[in-house]
Design a protein with these regions (language model features):
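Extended, low-polarity segments enriched in aliphatic/aromatic residues
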Residues: 23-307
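N-terminal export signals
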Residues: 2-21
């Protein structure tokens, strides 16, 4: 059973449950702010960057931008861009099976800059058509995945910032999807989607595998922040779901970041998430959490620190 370790300052409600503080050395740290604004967004980034203890170097800092979701909480993303020296918004091309529009670098640039993003502050990581096949330790469906070499070589840090979206092809779109698909190359995305682009358990396996491979290849240079706002979900038997603007969560642990975001909505234990039917777990995205845990891509146990 998962326990959430809390600071003495707060013991927040997570769904319909309150989790008591219990000693657990294996827990990952998750920072939480109930109020969704630029100040707290930046504060969580600063804490994560400090905790990551990344060396100062001349490489770029990236901020993951979702090219189809530029306007949601846009002011927060722009504030972070202005806050981080030598930073750019980063995005990758669509899957190679969709070569038009955002499926090629120039089309991607046109689509994003048409939404008002400064071309000089945007880096499409596929720009050089140079890719690295990164290995996936413990992958169940994939043993490697293609990622842009520019990401791996030119960036000292990337903040994987996501509007935690429901619904999504993956049930929800958070840290896992924004790494395993979002930071994969066009070919890498096609590897993850597979033949026929079917939303089935094997897709979730490949998504978890790719997330772990790219995360490991970046050697802990990824920071994860989920903005859980404007949430609308259908009722779920066994819990009282929460909707609306629920807060911001951030972690150096990919799985913990998504687990904490899901917990704000559903408030379940890992065993309770896992007990739902396969179809429910596919529809809700719970399989992301289960499969990431199985391949040791992160921790479902976390210490929640309220800022």
């Amino acid at each position: 059973r998962r326990t959430i370790l809390l600071t003495a300052a707060a013991m927040p409600m997570i769904g319909s449950k309150v989790f008591a503080a219990t000693p657990n050395q294996g827990a990952s740290t998750v920072y939480f702010s109930k109020d969704i604004n630029a100040e707290n967004f930046l504060a969580i980034y600063d804490r994560l960057r400090k905790d990551a203890n990344l060396p100062e170097d001349r490489r770029l800092s990236g901020i993951k931008l979702h090219g189809d979701d530029v306007d949601t909480n846009r002011g927060m993303w722009e504030a972070l861009l202005n806050h981080i020296p030598n930073s750019k918004f980063v995005e990758c091309n669509y899957a190679s099976i969709y070569p038009a529009g955002r499926g090629n670098t120039q089309g991607n640039i046109r689509a994003i800059t048409a939404q008002g993003v400064d071309k000089n502050r945007l880096d499409i990581l596929d720009r050089n058509n140079e890719y690295t096949e990164v290995p996936i330790k413990g992958g169940k469906e994939l043993k490697s995945v293609s990622a842009p070499t520019a990401l791996l070589k030119e960036y000292g840090c990337v903040a994987v910032t996501a509007n935690f979206r429901i619904p999504s092809f993956a049930g929800f779109s958070g840290a896992c999807k924004n790494v395993g698909i979002g930071l994969a190359s066009g070919e890498g995305k096609t590897q993850v989607h597979g033949l026929g682009v079917r939303k089935d358990a094997r897709f979730f396996r490949r998504l978890a595998d790719a997330s772990k491979g790219i995360h490991d290849a970046m050697d802990n240079r990824l920071l994860f922040i989920n903005v859980v706002s404007n949430i609308h979900v259908d009722p779920l038997k066994g819990t009282k779901v929460r909707t609306g603007n629920l807060g911001i969560v951030g972690s150096l642990d990919l799985l913990a970041a998504d687990q904490a975001a899901a917990d704000l909505i559903y408030g379940l234990t890992p065993a309770e998430y896992n007990a739902y039917s396969l179809q429910e777990k596919i529809d809700r995205g719970f399989l992301q959490l289960e499969y990431l845990d199985e391949i040791k891509a992160g921790n479902r146990t976390y210490k929640l620190i309220t800022l």
